[in-house]
């Protein structure tokens, strides 16, 4: 009886190993080799449009939310801390620049690379707000920035 169980396990593992090469290419995602470009699916994003007639307090709240809820943790931390420090003191033109900066690019990594001066910033995003973000990113005060700030600072009753 004992040897039959061992034999069954050996046979099962051999069968799995022999089937693995036919199953893995379907399940495994990795190098595509020389696959032609049309097989890549690109989901089009709607183009960014400035919200005309939006009240400044509503815009600040929306930008705070959008600064905190990014597609990558690095930008969540960086932009939420930046928004905490600067958003309430920004002028209307600065808010428009910031809105365009965080919402128009389709790739969050681009924003991160521009803010950290890893890649050159396109002319359309160059401006006062980008300069403020780049300076903030340098972290000259050597603050520990490991997480997005709590929202307690927004509670005006405290």
From Swiss-Prot:
SUPFAM superfamilies: YgfY-like
Function: Plays an essential role in the assembly of succinate dehydrogenase (SDH), an enzyme complex (also referred to as respiratory complex II) that is a component of both the tricarboxylic acid (TCA) cycle and the mitochondrial electron transport chain, and which couples the oxidation of succinate to fumarate with the reduction of ubiquinone (coenzyme Q) to ubiquinol. Required for flavinylation (covalent attachment of FAD) of the flavoprotein subunit sdha of the SDH catalytic dimer.
One example of a Gene Ontology biological process annotation: protein-FAD linkage
Protein name per the record: Succinate dehydrogenase assembly factor 2, mitochondrial
Family per record: Belongs to the SDHAF2 family.
Organelle targeting sequence: 1-17
Top-rank taxon: Eukaryota
Transmembrane segments: none
Record's subcellular location: Mitochondrion matrix
Keyword list, A-Z: Chaperone, Mitochondrion, Transit peptide
Gene: sdhaf2
């Amino acid at each position: 009886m004992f040897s039959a169980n061992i034999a069954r396990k050996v046979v099962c593992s051999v069968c799995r190993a022999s089937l693995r090469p036919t199953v893995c290419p379907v399940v495994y995602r990795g190098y595509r080799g020389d696959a032609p470009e049309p097989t890549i699916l690109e989901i089009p994003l709607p183009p960014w449009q400035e919200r005309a007639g939006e009240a400044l307090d509503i815009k600040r709240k929306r930008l705070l939310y959008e600064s905190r809820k990014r597609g990558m943790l690095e930008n969540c931390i960086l932009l939420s801390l930046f928004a905490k420090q600067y958003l309430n003191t920004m002028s209307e033109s600065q808010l428009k620049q910031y809105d365009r900066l965080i919402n128009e690019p389709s790739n969050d990594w681009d924003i991160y690379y521009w803010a950290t001066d890893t890649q050159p910033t396109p002319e359309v995003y160059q401006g006062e707000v980008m300069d403020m973000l780049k300076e903030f990113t340098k972290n000259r005060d050597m603050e520990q920035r490991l997480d997005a700030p709590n929202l307690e600072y927004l509670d005006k009753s405290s």
